[in-house]
């Protein structure tokens, strides 16, 4: 049985979102002009090189340590830093907009965002978007409370599992295509991925499934006493998604930029700002 739960956020489908997009771009230009104008040491050439960069609007949602807001309300995280550096090298400036994750495909197809970047797996979605090559790899895993009798994936039979809606874990538990994953009693599909943790902690669910990195981050931030099962659901490649009708070639150019960043060590250096073992995300692990 599947249950879906929703929360109210900015209505991204409305004309207000398009106004927001225009306002963000204009605001970015104004802020750059003001900031650069206060720096007397910069030349006119340097000022122009910054203010003239076209804006790439990146759609994402809150998912530490990949994308979240810092103490000042500014977007930060692995994906934010990677996007800013990669697009800078390509001659653009990246600007993140928090979206309803379930609306991501509609938003990018309508051009209200330029791409989707937020710990997003291409596995099984290859035909839905134009994808970059994977820039990182992540294990999708199951976590349970420390005192749980669930030790293996097989022990999930007849249990209740919390997942975020429209994610790979939701697909795996509902599709019944992987013989390793048993039928569970209930799948709680939550629009806000942060809610999967209280669902497990409060006992509404017997297990949760998500990216291992995100689970470990949440365990650290909130002192959660969870145990991650040894056997992963799967290992996925994380990519950046563009609309299939996008003809700018940004997906291919971004893939080449990722290769450059991998080769010069900047990819590992950026991930290392947030994780103690960045190399684990740079290679496929069983």
Each PLM stretch: what is its role?
Residues 60-62, 137-144, 220-259, 277-286:
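Periplasmic-binding protein-like
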Residues 80, 95-106, 187-198, 202, ...:
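Short helix-initiation/N-cap motifs at beta->coil->alpha
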Residues 80, 84, 93-155, 227-232:
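Acidic, polar ligand-binding/catalytic clefts
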Residues 40, 80-89, 150, 154-168, ...:
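Extended ligand-binding regions for polar small-molecule ligands
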Residues 53-78:
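Short glycine-rich His-centered loop
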Residues 92, 100, 133-183, 187, ...:
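A conserved helix-loop-strand patch within extracytoplasmic ligand-binding domains
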Residues 103-106, 119-128, 172-175, 199-235:
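A ligand-binding cleft/hinge motif common to bilobed small-molecule-binding domains
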Residues 69-71, 83-92, 169-191, 219-223:
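Ligand-binding cleft/hinge of the Venus flytrap
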């Amino acid at each position: 049985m599947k249950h879906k739960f929703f929360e109210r956020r900015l209505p991204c489908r409305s004309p207000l979102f398009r106004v927001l997009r225009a306002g963000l771009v204009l605001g970015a230009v104004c802020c750059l002009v003001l900031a650069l104008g206060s720096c007397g040491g910069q030349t006119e050439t340097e000022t122009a090189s910054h203010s003239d960069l076209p804006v790439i609007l990146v759609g994402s949602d809150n998912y530490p340590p990949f994308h979240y807001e810092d103490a000042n309300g500014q977007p930060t995280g692995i994906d934010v830093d990677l996007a800013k550096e990669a697009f800078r090298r390509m001659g653009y400036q990246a600007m993140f907009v928090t979206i309803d994750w379930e609306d991501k495909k509609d938003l990018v197809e309508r051009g209200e965002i330029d791409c989707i970047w937020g710990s997003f797996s291409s596995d099984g979605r290859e035909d839905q978007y134009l994808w970059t090559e994977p820039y990182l790899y992540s294990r999708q895993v199951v976590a349970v409370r420390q005192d749980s009798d669930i030790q293996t994936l097989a022990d999930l039979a007849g249990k209740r599992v919390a997942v975020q809606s429209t994610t790979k874990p939701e697909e795996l538990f509902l599709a019944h295509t992987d013989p390793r994953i048993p039928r569970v009693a209930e799948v709680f599909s939550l629009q806000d991925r942060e809610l999967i943790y209280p669902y497990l902690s409060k006992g509404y669910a017997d297990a949760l499934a998500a990216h291992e990195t995100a689970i470990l981050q949440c365990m650290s931030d909130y002192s959660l006493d969870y145990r991650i099962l040894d056997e992963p659901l799967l290992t996925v490649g994380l990519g950046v998604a563009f609309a299939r009708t996008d003809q700018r070639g940004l997906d291919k150019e971004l893939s080449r930029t990722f290769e450059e960043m991998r080769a010069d060590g900047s990819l590992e250096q950026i991930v290392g700002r947030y994780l103690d073992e960045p190399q684990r995300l740079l290679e496929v692990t069983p």
